[in-house]
């Protein structure tokens, strides 16, 4: 059985048997987690989202502070964001391990953000990273393709350590070979995976103009038996459509109200100007 109608679940070969999913890396972890949450809820699954490191607050999400009331929120919304709060950093942080275990027992799928990168698109983990719960079924590594062609100093979280790992200088650019190594090396994003299933999601494929680069990455990872999925989590801008009704005989008004001036500007022109500002 599989989620055949769901783009990201299908692309990452996520199956209903994958109940505890950890997401590591950089360049789109949180966005991927929320996209997977959306697809899982649409598939009728009860979902809990949490972190073992730090995660941005999401005020519009159903939130269970310290995991309290999580089950009721899942029943009401289909999913819940459950975490403790680091008030100094104004971020969400890890639940106590007992609470994390408890959370995993009240949902069909637990999605865990198990790494941090401060919004940088490229990352190599340090000794203490990532923080993957031991009961995890599958690990998804995320990296941003927009880092290709950028210098390590520009694109990497902890550029000095990243350059050391890659055998480069901080001023050197990140290449497709660097990306392949980052997601396939046991000291890279494969770190801590062990015998769990492993997937790679490479985000922002729209920033790569040469299709051959994507083909090369896919081919080399395939040779290592590492499934990779390319995509883009950027939200498309929604255009606002506006209709202005500008007709009528103006009998009660006594004159053509469309041409009636307010502060020297015809009413229709003033209204149109306001609508165009709203559309911006």
Please tell me what each predicted stretch does.
Residues 239-280:
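N-terminal glycine-rich phosphate-binding loop and ensuing alpha1 helix
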Residues 23, 48-51, 81-84, 110-114, ...:
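General beta-strand structural signal in soluble alpha/beta enzymes
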Residues 42-47, 105-109, 218-231:
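Structural alpha-beta junctions
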Residues 2, 90-98, 106, 115-223, ...:
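Conserved catalytic-core segment of NTP-binding enzymes
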Residues 4-41, 240-243:
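Walker A (P-loop) phosphate-binding motif
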Residues 77-80, 105-110, 138:
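Loop/turn-to-beta-strand initiation segments
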């Amino acid at each position: 059985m599989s989620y055949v109608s769901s783009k990201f679940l299908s692309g990452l070969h996520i199956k209903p048997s994958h109940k505890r999913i950890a997401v590591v890396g950089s360049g789109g972890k949180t966005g991927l987690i929320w996209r997977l949450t959306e697809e899982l809820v649409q598939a009728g699954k009860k979902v809990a989202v949490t972190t073992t490191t730090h995660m941005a607050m999401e005020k519009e999400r159903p939130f269970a502070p310290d995991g309290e009331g999580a089950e009721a929120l899942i029943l009401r919304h289909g999913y819940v964001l459950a975490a403790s709060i680091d008030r100094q950093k104004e971020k969400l942080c890890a639940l106590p391990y007992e609470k994390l275990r408890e959370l995993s027992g009240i949902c069909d799928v637990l999605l865990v953000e198990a790494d941090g990168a401060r919004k940088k698109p490229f990352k190599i983990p340090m000794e203490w990273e990532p923080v993957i719960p031991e009961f995890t079924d599958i690990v998804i590594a995320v990296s941003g393709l927009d880092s290709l062609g950028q210098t390590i100093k520009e694109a990497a979280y902890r550029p000095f350590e990243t350059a050391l790992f890659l055998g480069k200088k901080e001023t050197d650019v990140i290449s497709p070979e660097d990306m392949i190594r980052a997601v396939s090396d046991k000291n890279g994003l494969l770190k801590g995976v062990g015998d769990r299933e492993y997937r790679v999601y490479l985000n922002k494929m729209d920033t790569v103009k040469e299709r051959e680069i994507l083909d090369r990455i896919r081919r080399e990872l395939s040779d290592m038996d590492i499934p990779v999925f390319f995509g883009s989590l950027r939200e498309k801008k929604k255009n606002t459509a506006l209709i202005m009704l500008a007709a009528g005989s103006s009998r009660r008004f006594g004159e053509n109200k469309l041409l009636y001036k307010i502060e020297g500007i015809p009413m229709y022109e003033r209204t149109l100007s306001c609508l165009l500002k709203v559309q911006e």
